[in-house]
From Swiss-Prot:
Signal peptide location: none
Pfam families: IBV_3C (PF03620)
Membrane disposition: Single-pass type III membrane protein
UniProt entry tagged with the keyword Membrane: yes
Role summary: Plays a central role in virus morphogenesis and assembly. Acts as a viroporin and self-assembles in host membranes forming pentameric protein-lipid pores that allow ion transport. Also plays a role in the induction of apoptosis.
Summary of subunit composition and partner proteins: Homooligomer. Interacts with the M membrane protein in the budding compartment of the host cell, which is located between endoplasmic reticulum and the Golgi complex. The cytoplasmic tails of both proteins are important for this function. Interacts with Nucleoprotein.
Family statement drawn from the similarity comment of this UniProt entry: Belongs to the gammacoronaviruses E protein family.
Organism: Avian infectious bronchitis virus (strain UK/68/84)
GO cellular component: host cell Golgi membrane; membrane
UniProt KW keywords: Apoptosis, Host Golgi apparatus, Host membrane, Membrane, Transmembrane, Transmembrane helix
Stated name of the protein: Envelope small membrane protein
Cellular localisation: Host Golgi apparatus membrane
Membrane-side (Virion surface) residue stretches: 1-11
Side of membrane Intravirion, spans: 33-106
Amino acid sequence: MMNLLNTSLEENGSFLTALYVICEFVALYLLGRALQAFVQAADACCLFWYTWVVVPGAKGTAFVYKHTYGKKLNNPELEAVIVNEFPKNGWNNKNPANFQNGKLHT
């Protein structure tokens, strides 16, 4: 960097070199402002989609499920499932639960 600055000082003089350095700082400032505006616009876009699409979509899906498929579920049957006897380690379990004819065999 210093070599570039020294070369510019030798070839262009101190005034033009100072002018170039100031122009570089102005360009960096403008680039930063443009990036800031872009990020702000992207943030507003994400907030718009989340507020007007994602949340109502999730609420609508929950509403439809609750009033259609949710009413068809028989909760006593769900509560009768023996959750603690399912394999604790997924497919790697060496001793999986053994169900025969709907009953647990040990």
